[in-house]
Amino acid sequence: MHSVIHASDRIVVKVGSSLVTNDGRGLDLNALARWAEEVAELKRRGKQVVLVSSGAIAEGCQRLGWTVRPKGVHELQAAAAVGQMGLCQAYESAFRSFGLRTAQILLTHEDLADRTRYLNARSTLTSLLNLNVVPIINENDTVATSEIRFGDNDTLGALVTNLIEADALVILTDQRGLYSADPRKHPDAEFIHQAEAGDERLEDMAGGAGSSVGTGGMITKILAAKRAARSGAATVIASGREPHVLSRLADGEAIGTQLVAATNRMAARKQWLADHLKLAGRLLLDDGAALAIRERGTSLLPVGVSAVEGDFLRGEAVACVDAAGHEVARGLVNYSSDEARQIMRKSTREIEAALGYIVEPELIHRDNMVAL
């Protein structure tokens, strides 16, 4: 097995908190210098690199003299604001040693959920890469709330991979890669060298392995790889403790776990529908509707909906689930939740009688839906 990084021209590298901080107590400047050197080597080989880096909150806590990470949202946001200054300064200094410029990009889920802002972010990042700049991306913790948070930088890394249509995502952690079970609890766990990113068995294997410094366990990395695969990107989960890990991956050396994309690349708008929108509710489908969407990619008609969950407006994103609760698709609805409850199980010709008007014959048109 050879690493896919060797043949990848555009790469997103996510570096976890434990790899850039002193056990969560401020930034490890030597570690940042090392990552700058590694990325500079990839750049020397002609690769475009985006770096997704944690560390702002840990640095903020250090600067504010807090020995214990706070639990309050506003205290965490304050720490992020203070720490982001240090993170930017440290990376700017580290990359300057290799003749490279950096750019700071702070994102929230809301930025990518809005189609116009999504396209603007893609254009900006593409321009920076073409200017030979290294974009350094982090979640905008200072303003992010639970409704607009990505939740972890593994997810952010995958969404950025989709956004810029990168060839590969490298998730560097303090673990060797993916095992059949948590090796810290199961010494006989088998190491997984390669698998398909969409293999559902991976989620069962992932468990909750993860360091105490960041917010992401191994399960978030599996889900990130699944998201990245929708744009055709492979994911490598590897230990950031490995010497010269990025250079060796670029040489083709098999390090860590490689999760390959087994499905065809989704169209850009379908990727946006699949991963960048917050879900406002759920539609429960009957067996016929679920089968039609899975096998033929049809639009969803009201007659195929057996129940409506949540409160949503026209144009918001909802999940479509089958009788077993498995997500079949997600899409943008043509009717609000109140309207949907009035027209569910009804044929198209009965919509006007139920509502007094008809907006569209479909509850979700196939052009605004992505099958999962």
Curated annotation (Swiss-Prot):
PUA domain segment(s): 280-358
GO BP: L-proline biosynthetic process
The reaction(s) this protein catalyses: L-glutamate + ATP = L-glutamyl 5-phosphate + ADP
GO molecular function, one term: glutamate 5-kinase activity
Annotated EC: 2.7.2.11
Pathways involved: Amino-acid biosynthesis; L-proline biosynthesis; L-glutamate 5-semialdehyde from L-glutamate: step 1/2
InterPro entries: AceGlu_kinase-like_sf (IPR036393), Asp/Glu/Uridylate_kinase (IPR001048), G5K_ProB (IPR041739), Glu/AcGlu_kinase (IPR001057), Glu_5kinase (IPR011529), Glu_5kinase/COase_Synthase (IPR005715), Glutamate_5-kinase_CS (IPR019797), PUA (IPR002478)
Localization per Swiss-Prot or TrEMBL: Cytoplasm
NCBIfam families, per the entry: proB
Protein name from the UniProt record: Glutamate 5-kinase
Organism of this sequence: Chromobacterium violaceum (strain ATCC 12472 / DSM 30191 / JCM 1249 / CCUG 213 / NBRC 12614 / NCIMB 9131 / NCTC 9757 / MK)
